[in-house]
Amino acid sequence: MATKTCYYEVLKVERTATKQQVDRAYRKLAIKYHPDSNRDDGSATAKFKEATEAYEVLSDANKRARYDQYGHAGVEGATQQYGDVEDIFEAFGDLFGGGFGDFFGGGSRRGGGRRRVRRGADVRCDVTLTLEEAARGCHKDIVFRRRVSCDTCDGSGAAAGSEPVTCTMCGGQGQVIQSAGILRVQTTCPTCKGAGKQIGEPCGKCRGTGTQNEKAEMNVEIPAGVDDGMRVRLQGEGEPSPDGGPNGDCYCFISVKEHNLFKREGQHLILQMPISYAQAALGATINVPTLDGPHELTVPAGTQTGHVFTVRGQGIVDPRSGRTGDLLVQIFIEVPKKLSDKQQKLLRELAELDHDSVLPERTSFLDKLRHFFDPEPEEAGTGSTDTEKDS
């Protein structure tokens, strides 16, 4: 299996590069390796796709963070597979601008002067999950707004009894040719905005747009293992195409609430588990919480604060690979704030055995007063020793 080149090296940017710097670097490489300007270079298409793959990761904050931490393994399966160069321009059209692909003659790739059919716009909704819902998967009711075909004109934009007419500027192609020095650039028609048609008598309800606002409500399935910042795609649930093409998609942006016990790190869960001094010193069998209920864990004698035990398979499933992470139990020894007299006595005996220096026993305030007014006599033998020294 061939080793992949570092994405930062592919785009020729530093690891600290900003999103804007990544965008500029990708545009530069896209122009350099575009197949239409490198017809005699068979490797140009491969380099173009390699740059696109690198850009798709480094331009996305979540994918970039996983790549920085785990390398290519962290984003395996997270990038799109593009059939041809035109698919790339469909995906990153906003970055290049409307006429970028046609600048290199991309229009001929779609059958000469045919008008390009555009997808409908994508929409978004926000979904908040508990950690348990994210781990197991769930069904959620979502509400979002989108534009749909006008129910009065059926999306034509024209009033009843009239029909859209062919655009006189572009001849129905949706695009026009503009000269820029020795270059001829094909761009979206400014008159019909790429639709290829003009509305003579607009619909009174939608005012010629062919769409109307809608509040969409649906129940969606959230797959197990999603993480904060991920997106769930609802294909075809976006807005309609202005050209009769496919609808856009709805993307559900996932937000996962913090848990009061567990902290998530990728597919692993981290739990800080308190145990007593006696349990740490002598060993114990304790019950630790998991998302599936209590789990029995054996703590060997002499366990130190900070030791981590791994409970296999009690983490979060990876929605791409299907592998399940682990529960990492981090031990810390909890020191009691209050001790009974017996507990204090036993601990002092232990300290004496270990030759540990500890604070003396507390003396009550009344004992201190009694000692102040009636101090104890000096120990016998102290005075005679001084006398002997004087002599």
Curated annotation (Swiss-Prot):
One of its GO terms (biological process) is DNA replication. A zinc finger (CR-type) spans 137-215. Zn(2+) 1 binds at C150, C153, C203, C206. Zn(2+) 2 binds at C167, C170, C189, C192. Pfam families: DnaJ, DnaJ_C, DnaJ_CXXCXGXG. Its main location: cytoplasm. Its cofactor is Zn(2+). InterPro entries: DnaJ, DnaJ_C, DnaJ_domain, DnaJ_domain_CS, HSP40/DnaJ_pept-bd, HSP_DnaJ_Cys-rich_dom, HSP_DnaJ_Cys-rich_dom_sf, J_dom_sf. One of its GO terms (molecular function) is unfolded protein binding. It comes from the Bacteria. Keywords: Chaperone, Cytoplasm, DNA replication, Metal-binding, Repeat, Stress response, Zinc, Zinc-finger. Residues 372-391 are annotated as: Disordered. Binds 2 Zn(2+) ions per monomer. Homodimer. Participates actively in the response to hyperosmotic and heat shock by preventing the aggregation of stress-denatured proteins and by disaggregating proteins, also in an autonomous, DnaK-independent fashion. Unfolded proteins bind initially to DnaJ; upon interaction with the DnaJ-bound protein, DnaK hydrolyzes its bound ATP, resulting in the formation of a stable complex. GrpE releases ADP from DnaK; ATP binding to DnaK triggers the release of the substrate protein, thus completing the reaction cycle. This is Chaperone protein DnaJ. It comes from Rhodopirellula baltica (strain DSM 10527 / NCIMB 13988 / SH1).
